[in-house]
Amino acid sequence: MAKANEIKRGSAVSYNGKLLLVKDIDIQAPSARGASTLYKMRFTDIRTGQKVEERFKGDDILDTISLTRRSVNFSYIDGDEYVFMDDEDFTPYHFKKEQIEEELLFIPEGGLPGMQVLTIEGQVIALELPQTVDMVIEETAPGIKGASASARTKPAKMSTGLTVQVPEYISSGERIRIHIAERRYMGRCD
């Protein structure tokens, strides 16, 4: 049991008879005095895969479920299944493409360090990514000299199909860091 304001992204809760995995949380602070802060949570139903959205007050009590997290690396593709290998005991974890379609946009060809598989009682629930990923820009409009003074952005496409907005001075072939949850440019990589 935990209060709604203690729930974090990647947690699992039981609510209205459903097992839900927290994908995103929006915090809405009230403008009136005495009103309580609202937590708008977006979930994925673990059993059905459906997206669910609920609102909670900060002191609402939710029933939390303990998850097991295992560090994994991307191994290979088998038909429409993606196989991830446990870093310690080499257990393979299989995901259908539909299950991890969003996550695949952030996994470059060489893999992504820091990935984890979430399980409940041995059942694979989800693939969790780290907060940031470093990727090389495949395609963007040419960089403009002296554009660092302006705050204008342009779209940049990565090899995985992901498109993010980058500053005008960034060129194709540059390595950038992307914040995964917010899908935004954070800076250049060394």
UniProtKB/Swiss-Prot annotation:
GO molecular function: translation elongation factor activity
CDD domains linked: S1_EF-P_repeat_1 (cd04470), S1_EF-P_repeat_2 (cd05794)
Protein's GO biological process: peptide biosynthetic process
GO cellular component: cytoplasm
InterPro entries documented for this protein: Elong-fact-P_C, NA-bd_OB-fold, Rib_uL2_dom2, Transl_elong_fac_P/YeiP, Transl_elong_KOW-like, Transl_elong_p-like_YeiP, Transl_elong_P/YeiP_cen, Transl_elong_P/YeiP_CS
One Pfam family in the UniProt entry: EFP_N
Family as reported in the entry's similarity comment: Belongs to the elongation factor P family.
Name of this chain's protein: Elongation factor P-like protein
Organism: Photorhabdus laumondii subsp. laumondii (strain DSM 15139 / CIP 105565 / TT01) (Photorhabdus luminescens subsp. laumondii)
Top-level taxonomy: Bacteria, Pseudomonadati, Pseudomonadota, Gammaproteobacteria, Enterobacterales
